C-alpha cells in the first residue's frame, strides 16, 4: 500500500520552518505496512496545490496533506480541496463547538476563528481534540486523501488516534519488518564490497540500505510481504548471515545511539565517566547527559578550549603544548589523565583538534583531531584526519571518542 505526503506552506520552502511532520508520518505509516513513496512541499498557491494533489492521487492509494488550515487569508487548503473535489464549504455546528472548547479562556472568538467551523460538504470530518482545525477525509475512486493541520502536535495526535486506525481498517497492507545494524570500522565503499556476495543473494522480498553517519554506517534490512511470520523468518535468516560476516564490527542490532550503549555498559560495570573536550566543546558530554539516568555514571566535563585551561584544570604541561602542540597525541593523553584525576572517575575521553573552517596548517590540516580514551590505567588513542566541515568534524570526533571508549571498556 503506497502513500504520498504533501506539505503546504511558503514557510517550508524558504527554510523558515523545518518539515518534521513527513519524517514522523513516514515512520508511523511504515509500522502498519504503508509505504511512503514521495513527499512534496508546495507553496500556498491554489494552482500548485491542485497540481500536486492531482499527481499524487494518480500515483498513490493514500494522500496525506498537512498545512494551510488556519483562519487567516493565506490558509487556502480547504477552499482549494473543495475546488479539486467539486464540493463547497458549509458551516458545521459540531466543529464550531470544538473550536469554542479549544479556544475557551485563551483566545476570544471572532469571525476568523469562527471560520474554522467551515468544512467541505462532501467529506468525512474528523474532530481535532487538541486544535481548532478539523481533519477532512475525502474518498475518490477507491483512494483516500486526508487533510490535516500542519502544527506537529495536532498532526501527530489526529494521525495516531484517528487517521492511521481508519487507514488500517480500510486498506489491506503488507507486513514490513526492519532490522538495523550499526557497523563500525568501515568506509561505506569498503563495507559494500565486503557484503557484495551476500547482498546479491538476498531474496526478492528483502532490501538492503546503507545509511552512513559520521564514523558509523547503519545497515537497514527491510523485508516486505503479506505473511508477517514468513517475512520475519526471512529477515532473521539473512541477519544471522550478516552477523557471521561482520562479527564484532557490528556495534548494535537495534539502531541504539552510542551514548545509550555507553551508559548501559558503564552501569553494568559500575564505572564512572568524565570528559575533557577542546574542539568538541562539550558535545560528548551533552550526548551522554541526554540519556535519562546518566547521573548514575557521568560526573562531569571540563571544556578545555584554551591552552591555559588545559594546563590549569587538566594538568597538561606547558612543555607538551610548546613541543607537540595542543593538537597532538601527547596532549590528549595528558588531558584524559587530568580529567580522571580532577573528577575522580574510572574512565574518561578527551579530544583536541581543528574543527575548521580555519586554523589548519600543512602539518595539521582542518579536520585533524586527536582522541584519547582511558579506563583506569589503560589508555588508547586515535587520530581523525577527514575534513567534512566544522559540524560534521565535531560529530565524527564525538562518535569516535565514544566508540574508542566502548572498545576499551568492553
UniProtKB/Swiss-Prot annotation:
SMART domains: MoCF_biosynth
InterPro entries: CinA, CinA-like_C, CinA_C, CinA_KH, Competence-induced_CinA, MoaB/Mog-like_dom_sf, MoaB/Mog_dom
UniProt record similarity statement: Belongs to the CinA family.
Protein name per Swiss-Prot or TrEMBL: CinA-like protein
Organism encoding this protein: Bacteroides fragilis (strain YCH46)
Taxonomic path: Bacteria, Pseudomonadati, Bacteroidota, Bacteroidia, Bacteroidales
